[in-house]
């Protein structure tokens, strides 16, 4: 086998192999040549070449999201490293393991005016779970840092940074290893299955007539046992609110939070106000539920997560450091159902909301809302759905999604910058049929996501083009003036047609219901190349239709 001559590069590669790191995404450069040579010629790794570092990092994020194992990104020195930052931040807040390996110049070359050189050490300090700043020569100390970085990424489910200085010459190779790096054993994190102060928690649970369970994004399928979900559904004192990205389903759960609470007045909110709020999963999309819980605070807010708990509603009283499934399997057998009208009252309101929604959708014209209804209805069963941020995820929250479909969205930092790249990486990582729904600004922002040769041929993009950032028409402050159109909405007349041609994707387009239905069928049946269906919706009608929807729910 061919190895890089530089011993430090050998150590990094051998430790990655020993730790089971498999997916390596490499961006081209010279300073990282020792790493590229070693990773690319080692059969223990699956390597990908992606030129744009921002896209490469989000591509790796998508793979790690699906495999639940760290993916590594490798880049040269200088500003290349900084382009990883959006994905590093997303990985940090979404609890996704990501290993950043950056090549650097030796310490003596930093801040002396040498080319392609920045201060790389600790550059991700505020959004990483470990930073390994290596010295130039191979050593046990460096080996321990590399081991620690990889183990921390696994145990703390977050991004780590390994910064490796290399001196020229960079391209020399050898046929035998010159090092035997030290490999440490992963210290297993023993997750507790015991509830702290259990008697007190059981007492609070059994005495509470209004228990609200709010579930955010969950990337792991079947994370909660069916028996636990059934218990939630049968308890009249429990209301369960799920976000689209929770991937948890039950007929009694409320899966369109905004449809339920947007029309509420003060008396309705007081009916929903919980005594106990239990949260688990990732970041919450719905601004309305966050505003509600910040105003109508629960007496007790318990968050269940093995790593961290955010005081999102300024009411956090207890963080249970354990898996949610373990928490409920431990707690529920010791509890009893409480006589309450909490669920029945809220469920009755939600049933009426669903009737009103069906009536409204049946009468509206072609628009973003109508398109989302038809697109989500059309999704193939047992496929995966990736959704971009901004208005796309918010529309998706309003539509029922088949329980067999897994849903993902970059809600850690909620940015539009890497949604397409993440979706492509997720399609590669999962191996499942994957549909990506995105808006025009998000798609154009990350169009380099299509600049790689790894996109599965059955990957589908449904691009909803409303001529700008449609979410700004929904938000407060919208005024039809040049400043709004130029600086907020960023109005445009661009299409994806020529991008699709350049990247050899099949291209379809629709601008009414008939062409949408026709081209959705063509899109799903076309698997010779990745497909893009671009749907053009009316810029000036979308926000009016959505706002009227919430008015007609009462």
From Swiss-Prot:
The keyword Glycoprotein does not apply. Binds 1 thiamine pyrophosphate per subunit. It is an enzyme of class 2 (transferase). Its cofactor is Mg(2+); Mn(2+); thiamine diphosphate. Its EC number is 2.2.1.9. SUPFAM superfamilies: Thiamin diphosphate-binding fold (THDP-binding). The keyword Transferase applies. Keywords: Magnesium, Manganese, Menaquinone biosynthesis, Metal-binding, Thiamine pyrophosphate, Transferase. GO terms for biological process: menaquinone biosynthetic process. It catalyses: isochorismate + 2-oxoglutarate + H(+) = 5-enolpyruvoyl-6-hydroxy-2-succinyl-cyclohex-3-ene-1-carboxylate + CO2. Transmembrane segments: none annotated. Pathway: Quinol/quinone metabolism; 1,4-dihydroxy-2-naphthoate biosynthesis; 1,4-dihydroxy-2-naphthoate from chorismate: step 2/7; Quinol/quinone metabolism; menaquinone biosynthesis. InterPro entries: MenaQ_synth_MenD (IPR004433), MenD_middle (IPR032264), THDP-binding (IPR029061), Thiamin_PyroP_enz_TPP-bd_dom (IPR012001), TPP_enzyme_TPP-bd (IPR011766). Pfam families: TPP_enzyme_C, TPP_enzyme_M_2, TPP_enzyme_N. GO terms for molecular function: 2-succinyl-5-enolpyruvyl-6-hydroxy-3-cyclohexene-1-carboxylic-acid synthase activity; magnesium ion binding; manganese ion binding; thiamine pyrophosphate binding. Homodimer. Catalyzes the thiamine diphosphate-dependent decarboxylation of 2-oxoglutarate and the subsequent addition of the resulting succinic semialdehyde-thiamine pyrophosphate anion to isochorismate to yield 2-succinyl-5-enolpyruvyl-6-hydroxy-3-cyclohexene-1-carboxylate (SEPHCHC). Belongs to the TPP enzyme family. MenD subfamily. This is 2-succinyl-5-enolpyruvyl-6-hydroxy-3-cyclohexene-1-carboxylate synthase. It comes from Flavobacterium johnsoniae (strain ATCC 17061 / DSM 2064 / JCM 8514 / BCRC 14874 / CCUG 350202 / NBRC 14942 / NCIMB 11054 / UW101). The lineage of its organism: Bacteria, Pseudomonadati, Bacteroidota, Flavobacteriia, Flavobacteriales.
């Amino acid at each position: 086998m061919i190895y890089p001559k530089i011993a430090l590069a050998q150590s990094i590669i051998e430790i990655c192999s020993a730790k089971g790191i498999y997916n390596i995404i490499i961006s081209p450069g010279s300073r990282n040549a020792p790493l590229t040579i070693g990773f690319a010629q080692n059969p223990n790794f699956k390597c990908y070449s992606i030129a744009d570092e921002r896209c490469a990092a989000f591509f790796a994020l998508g793979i790690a999201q699906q495999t639940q194992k760290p993916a590594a990104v490798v880049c040269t020195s200088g500003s290349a490293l900084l382009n990883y930052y959006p994905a590093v931040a997303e990985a940090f807040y979404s609890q996704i393991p990501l290993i950043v390996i950056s090549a650097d110049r030796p310490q003596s070359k930093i801040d002396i005016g040498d080319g392609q050189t920045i201060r790389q050490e600790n550059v991700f300090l505020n959004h990483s779970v470990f930073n390994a700043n290596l010295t130039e020569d191979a050593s046990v100390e460096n080996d321990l840092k590399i081991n620690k970085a990889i183990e921390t990424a696994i145990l703390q489910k977050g991004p780590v940074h390994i910064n490796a200085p290399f001196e020229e010459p960079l391209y020399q190779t050898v046929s035998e290893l010159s090092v035997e790096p030290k490999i440490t054993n992963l210290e297993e994190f023993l997750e507790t299955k015991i509830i702290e102060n259990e008697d007190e928690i059981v007492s609070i649970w059994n005495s509470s007539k209004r228990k609200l369970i709010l579930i955010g994004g969950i990337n792991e399928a079947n994370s909660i046992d069916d028996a636990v979900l059934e218990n939630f559904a049968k308890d009249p004192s429990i209301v369960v609110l799920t976000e689209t990205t929770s991937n948890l389903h039950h007929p009694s759960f409320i899966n369109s939070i905004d449809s339920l609470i947007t029309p509420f007045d003060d008396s309705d909110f007081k009916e929903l106000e919980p005594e106990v709020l239990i949260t688990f999963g990732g970041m919450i999309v719905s601004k309305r539920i966050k505003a509600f819980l910040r105003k109508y605070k629960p007496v007790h807010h318990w968050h269940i997560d093995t790593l961290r708990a955010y005081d999102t509603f300024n009411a956090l009283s207890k963080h249970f450091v354990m898996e949610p499934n373990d928490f409920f399997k431990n707690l529920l057998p010791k509890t009893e159902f409480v006589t309450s009208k909490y669920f029945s009252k809220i469920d009755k309101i939600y049933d009426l909301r669903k009737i009103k929604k069906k009536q409204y959708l049946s009468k509206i014209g072609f628009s973003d809302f109508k398109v989302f209804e038809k697109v989500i209805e059309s999704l193939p069963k047992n496929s995966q759905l990736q959704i971009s941020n901004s208005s796309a995820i918010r529309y998706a929250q309003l539509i029922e999604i088949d329980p067999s479909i897994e849903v993902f969205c970059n809600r850690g930092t909620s940015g539009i910058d890497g949604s397409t790249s993440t979706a492509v990486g997720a399609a590669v990582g999962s191996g499942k049929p994957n549909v990506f729904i995105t808006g025009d600004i998000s798609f154009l922002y990350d169009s380099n996501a299509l600049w790689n040769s790894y996109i599965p041929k059955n990957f589908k993009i449904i691009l909803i083009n409303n001529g700008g950032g449609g979410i700004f028409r929904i938000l407060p402050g919208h005024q039809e003036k040049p400043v709004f159109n130029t600086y907020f909405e960023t109005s445009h007349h661009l299409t994806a047609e020529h991008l699709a041609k350049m990247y050899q994707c099949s291209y379809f387009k629709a601008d009414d219901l008939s062409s949408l239905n026709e081209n959705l069928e063509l899109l799903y049946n076309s698997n010779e190349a990745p497909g893009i269906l671009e749907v053009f919706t009316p810029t000036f009608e979308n926000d009016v239709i959505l706002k009227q929807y919430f008015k007609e729910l009462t």
